[in-house]
Structures are given as structure tokens and as C-alpha cells.
């Protein structure tokens, strides 16, 4: 059976960096208040010229270059985002045009902060089914355009950016143990009102801003993500000792640390970027993955575990061997 191999990764972060101290000049907060509650020190915010599609395309170009591939090798483009530039066409087809890709197809998927894990699952399914040989999975967000700048419960948490992974079908020359081992997706709609955007493009004059019950999100996050991680390990007969790296959704340092402890993983096995990137929603996992690959922490053969929870509620996990 064909497996999906992550052949390349890439990322794009906006040109504007905003520290906590700079943010405190705009809203009623402080560096100490933000760090204590979230672990965030700064975030990247998109300029007017840095659209969701632009950032997604830049990340995709870098992932293709890292994989030694070109736009001609792309059969499908999947973009996980909650902040598309327009209702339609999809960000994915805008990316297709920006890359100069002439074949295949693209679509967006909306699973909030779980989006990249959902995208990996869809991309993996396309490759396993034989419908595609090369798939770009991208997480891209411009949450700064949906923030209520008077609500410090949310406006200190989020940042903008994009991360991408190029999946290719395995060949006879590949190590049969390499690739995406399994993905596990969940949702529970009854909790949709604890994290949402209170509007939509279809609501005249009200595109919406983020609304969040932080305590409830925290309460669900650790338990549900741990369940998804344990499910992934059990499906592959693995234990925490077999995991080389945990690449979690970068929402809050306290949640990340709690996840590591719950899984008995030492801090040095957990990739953390939330301090510099803040919460970039669907972009957070691929941004963190890219950093750990590029700096040499994640090597070929590394067993990598990903997990995320987002509005919906949606949550899930993916486990793979690089």
C-alpha cells in the first residue's frame, strides 16, 4: 500500500513583529500579564499586502523547494484556514495560480486550530487511494484581521503566518516504515459556543471577531488532545518512549506543558514556538514542524506526533515517521 511521506516543509512569517510591550501600548495589558498566562512574548502580524493566499503560496514554494519538487509535481492543494481572503474562490485555488500549477485541484477546509491535522488526514487519504501522488497541505491564517482590539482575553493570543508540507506517495525505494502512520479526527459540536467567531462573510456588515471562554477551552484541550494522542500511539503499538518529537498546536504554553506531562514526555522532546509565533491556529503545527526540521532537531526516521484542538470543537492527532 502507498504511504504518504512528508518530503518537504516550508513556512512564511509576516514582516511585522509585535512584542508584548508594543501591544501594551495599544490595549490594556502588560508583558508580565501575557507571559504569565500564555507564555507568549511576541507575534507576527500581516500587513495589508500579506494576504492569506500570499502567505500560503510563499510557504508552499519553500516546501516544494525543500522537497526538490516543482508546481508540476502538485496534484492537489489543501489549505486549512479560518481566515480566507474571500468567500470564494478558495485560498487553495489562489495558491494554485500563484504557484503556476496547471493541473490537479485545490480546496479549503475549516477546522479552526485543528485544520492542519485534518488537512494531513485528507492529503494522506488522497495518496493512499491513488487519486494523487503529490499533495500540498497548508495551514495559513491572518487572525489579526478578526481580533477585537478591545478584548485582551483574545487579542494578545493570536498571530499570523503560514506553514506547508509537501506529501508524496512512497515508492519501492523508500523505507516501508517511513511516512504517515495514522491520523485520528474528532469533533463535538455541542461545545461550539466556547470558541467561535461571532459573524460570517454572509452576515451583512458583520464579518465577526473571536469569542472565547478560555477556561472551558483549557479544560477540554488537555483531556481531548491526550485522548487523541493515546489513540494514535495505541493504533501503532507505540509508547511515549517511542516518540522522538511532539509537535503540538501552539495555543498556550501551559497547555503544551500539561500535554507533555500527561504523556510523560520530557520537555526536550516537545517543540515549542508559541513564545515567538503566538497562536497561529491552523498554521501553528506546520510552522513548528518547519522550524524543528530546518534546525536539525527532526531528522529522517524521527517519529513525530502532532495534536491539536480548535473551535468546533474539533481535535485530532497524526503520527508519522519522517
UniProtKB/Swiss-Prot annotation:
Q: In which pathway does it act?
A: Lipid metabolism; fatty acid biosynthesis
Q: Where in the cell is it found?
A: Cytoplasm
Q: Which residues form the signal peptide?
A: none
As its record notes, the protein acts as a catalyst of: malonyl-[ACP] + acetyl-CoA + H(+) = 3-oxobutanoyl-[ACP] + CO2 + CoA
Record keywords, A-Z:
Acyltransferase, Cytoplasm, Fatty acid biosynthesis, Fatty acid metabolism, Lipid biosynthesis, Lipid metabolism, Multifunctional enzyme, Transferase
Which InterPro entries did the record assign?
A: ACP_syn_III_C (IPR013747), ACP_syn_III_N (IPR013751), FabH (IPR004655), Thiolase-like (IPR016039)
Q: Where is this region: ACP-binding?
A: 250-254
Which Pfam families does the entry mention?
ACP_syn_III, ACP_syn_III_C
Q: Does the keyword Lipid metabolism apply?
A: yes
* Gene Ontology biological process terms from the UniProt entry: fatty acid biosynthetic process; secondary metabolite biosynthetic process
- Say where the protein is mainly found: cytoplasm
A molecular-function term among this protein's GO annotations: 3-oxoacyl-[acyl-carrier-protein] synthase activity
Query: Under which EC number(s) is this enzyme classified?
Result: 2.3.1.180
Swiss-Prot/TrEMBL domain comment: The last Arg residue of the ACP-binding site is essential for the weak association between ACP/AcpP and FabH.
Biological role: Catalyzes the condensation reaction of fatty acid synthesis by the addition to an acyl acceptor of two carbons from malonyl-ACP. Catalyzes the first condensation reaction which initiates fatty acid synthesis and may therefore play a role in governing the total rate of fatty acid production. Possesses both acetoacetyl-ACP synthase and acetyl transacylase activities. Its substrate specificity determines the biosynthesis of branched-chain and/or straight-chain of fatty acids.
Q: Which PANTHER family does this one have?
A: 3-OXOACYL-[ACYL-CARRIER-PROTEIN] SYNTHASE 3, BETA-KETOACYL-[ACYL-CARRIER-PROTEIN] SYNTHASE III
List, alphabetically, the NCBIfam families matched.
Answer: fabH, PRK09352.1
Task: Please report which protein family the annotation says this sequence is part of.
Answer: Belongs to the thiolase-like superfamily. FabH family.
What is this protein identified as? Beta-ketoacyl-[acyl-carrier-protein] synthase III
Instruction: Please give the organism.
Output: Granulibacter bethesdensis (strain ATCC BAA-1260 / CGDNIH1)
- Source organism lineage? Bacteria, Pseudomonadati, Pseudomonadota, Alphaproteobacteria, Acetobacterales
Name of the gene: fabH
Amino acid at each position: 500500500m502507498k504511504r504518504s511521506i512528508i518530503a518537504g516543509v516550508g513556512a512564511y512569517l509576516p514582516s511585522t513583529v509585535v512584542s508584548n510591550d508594543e501591544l501594551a501600548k495599544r490595549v490594556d495589558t502588560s508583558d508580565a500579564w501575557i507571559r504569565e498566562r500564555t507564555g507568549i512574548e511576541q507575534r507576527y502580524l500581516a500587513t495589508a499586502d500579506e494576504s492569506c493566499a500570499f502567505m500560503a503560496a510563499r510557504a508552499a514554494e519553500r516546501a516544494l523547494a525543500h522537497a526538490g519538487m516543482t508546481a508540476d509535481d502538485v496534484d492537489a492543494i489543501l489549505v486549512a484556514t479560518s481566515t480566507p481572503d474571500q468567500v470564494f474562490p478558495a485560498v487553495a485555488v489562489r495558491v494554485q495560480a500563484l504557484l503556476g500549477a496547471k493541473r490537479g485541484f485545490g480546496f479549503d477546509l475549516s477546522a479552526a486550530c485543528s485544520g492542519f491535522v485534518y488537512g494531513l488526514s485528507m492529503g494522506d487519504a488522497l495518496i493512499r487511494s491513488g487519486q494523487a501522488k503529490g499533495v500540498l497541505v497548508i495551514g495559513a491564517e491572518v487572525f489579526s484581521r478578526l481580533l477585537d482590539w478591545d478584548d485582551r482575553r483574545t487579542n494578545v493570543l493570536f498571530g499570523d503566518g503560514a506553514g506547508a508540507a509537501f506529501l508524496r506517495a512512497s515508492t519501492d525505494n523508500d523505507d516501508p516504515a517511513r511516512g504517515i502512520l495514522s491520523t485520528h479526527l474528532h469533533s463535538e459540536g455541542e461545545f461550539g459556543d466556547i470558541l467561535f467567531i461571532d459573524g460570517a462573510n454572509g452576515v451583512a456588515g458583520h464579518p465577526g471577531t473571536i469569542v472565547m471562554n478560555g477556561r472551558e477551552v483549557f479544560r477540554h484541550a488537555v483531556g481531548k488532545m491526550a485522548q487523541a494522542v493515546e489513540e494514535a500511539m495505541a493504533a501503532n503499538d507505540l509508547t511515549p518512549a517511542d516518540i522522538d518529537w511532539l509537535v503540538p498546536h501552539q495555543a498556550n504554553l501551559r497547555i503544551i506543558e500539561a500535554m507533555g506531562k500527561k504523556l510523560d514526555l520530557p520537555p526536550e522532546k516537545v517543540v515549542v514556538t508559541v513564545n515567538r509565533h503566538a497562536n497561529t491556529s491552523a498554521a501553528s503545527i506546520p510552522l513548528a514542524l518547519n522550524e524543528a526540521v530546518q534546525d536539525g532537531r527532526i531528522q529522517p526516521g524521527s517519529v513525530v506526533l502532532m495534536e491539536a484542538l480548535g473551535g468546533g470543537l474539533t481535535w485530532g492527532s497524526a503520527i508519522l515517521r519522517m
